[in-house]
Design a protein with these regions (language model features):
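Charged, amphipathic alpha-helical segments and their flanking helix caps
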Residues: 1-36, 58-159
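Short acidic low-complexity segments
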Residues: 35-47
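A short, hydrophobic beta-strand-centered structural micro-motif
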Residues: 47-55
Length: 159
């Protein structure tokens, strides 16, 4: 059976993405202060920050049904900028990204009770799909990036 793929609208992507971003900002993660969360852009290259970045060109509908319902995948990056001046700091730098993956897994097993999705969105999976890796190192600061993905069912017109 062939899988039919279509891109999500930017409006739907943002509507669902905002639910996930709001959930992440409320999480208690060691060494991550609420003020460190950024959306799309980091504001400094000298202080620790965690940034959520949309990947809208990879968000897509899978297998749309006759009444308009479909399964969708919504990928996003989380980038963590932190000091890498010591070997110990470098070893600990992926901890927040790994903790986020664990929190997402817990939320999934609890039927997404803490994330407020619109009524027509039925979340199925929220998981890390690409493990953290370093993307840059400059002036003792490094950025580690991991990719996560939400899979959900969008209800059709008569569901």
């Amino acid at each position: 059976m062939e899988i039919k793929r279509n891109k999500l609208t930017f409006e739907e992507y943002n509507r669902v993405f905002e639910c996930i971003y709001g959930f992440m900002k409320k999480l208690e993660i060691p060494n991550i202060k609420k003020s460190m969360w950024k959306l799309e852009f980091m504001t400094s290259s000298k202080s620790d920050q965690i940034m959520v970045q949309r990947v809208s060109n990879r968000a897509e509908k899978l297998n749309e049904n006759i009444i308009g319902g479909y399964t969708a995948v919504l990928p996003f990056y989380i980038n963590y900028l932190s000091s890498a001046r010591t070997e110990d700091a470098l070893l600990r730098i992926t901890e927040p990204l790994d903790i986020l993956a664990k929190k997402f897994e817990e939320e999934m097993h609890n039927n997404f009770i803490s994330i407020s999705f619109p009524d027509d969105i039925v979340p199925q999976r929220l998981e890390m799909v690409v493990n953290p890796g370093s993307t840059t190192l400059e002036n003792g600061m490094t950025v580690f990036t991991a990719m996560y993905q939400l899979t959900y069912y969008k209800k059709g017109a008569f569901e």
